Amino acid sequence: MIPYGDFTFFLIALIALLPVIILGFLGKRSYIYNGVVTAFMIVLIFSSDKHNLFDQKYLSVQLISFIIYVVWQVLLIMFYYHSKPKNNSFSKFVTVMVLSILPLALVKVLQSTWLGGHQIHFHESKLIEFVGFLGISYVTFKSVQLIMEIRDGSIKEIKVWKLIQFISFFPTISSGPIDRYKRFVKDDKKVPTGNEYRELVLKAIHMIMLGFLYKYIVAYFINTYAIMPLQLDLHGFVNLWLYMYAYSLYLFFDFAGYSLFAIAFSYLFGIKTPPNFDKPFKAKNIKDFWNRWHMTLSFWFRDCIYMRSLFYMSRKKLLKSQFAMSNVAFLINFFIMGIWHGIEVYYIVYGLYHAALFIGYDYYERWRKKHPPRWQNGFTTALSIVITFHFVTFGFLIFSGKLI
């Protein structure tokens, strides 16, 4: 069952969370019941009529893959956490990181169309249908972030149960938002008062209503009356251009709607999962856009890839210019972001396209410091928003695979 994919999911989830909500209004929390309802929802999410054991839909291959994955990540993280005080070598860190990312890398390779007719099959089905699970990318982000923070020394304590709870938190399991371990545990430890929980519930209701508007009304109409008709003929320039607008708006309303649902259900647990979107199409430049679009992903890449690449190059003095090192870090950052989406050519080009936009904007910012604008008013602000919007939507056209 796809999280937030139909009304049945909402009904089952809300019924399952009813004791959580009642206890929340009383200013209490049952960690045991939270664990039970999480396990129940995980089994439901990964249930499958096709790929299962003993013809039991709730004993699915995806569920087994998820359990194996969680055990694998917990063993890796706890091993690194306990062995780090004795040996925090770079080689050990890299080894643990590679082993943590390995399941995701395998899934991305098996998903790729590069294999063509050479897809590996198992019992007359593609192997990818038996490997991996819904949300493996986002769960891997959590694990990798945690390993990095252990190396940095910012994580002082990890308990196995809290780690499992963090990795398998069902409201955000399929597509984020991507939370941080320290922030998650802080919310989990602090039980909100009855009044505080009422505020969380009111915010959750608002987000659920807005999410329905975004995902099930606006995104549905865009897909039905714009994207689907345009896909019938994308050979003309005008149709391709209109598809670019429609697809970009659909991506936002569909994913923003999902994110609102995920955050709302997190709030019902008393967990204030961070937001994912902040009016991204009002961005005045490409940097502003990535501070507004898929923010938890953007900030994850900024902290885990860009900043660490820049720090490494600075420490090793690989380049003389800090500006040049920053641009190389942008290139690394967005290249990895591209292949994270998939190893298809258009995903890689999408990542490199945004790297080029960042590097180009960096050059523009340096030039602008020496040549301050003569006019800066509402018109110039609106113009910058329009220009940024078109650069961004063209990137989404690349991302859609319809251009390449």
Identify the residue ranges that each predicted region occupies.
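Membrane-embedded transmembrane alpha-helical bundles that form the catalytic cores
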Residues: 1-404
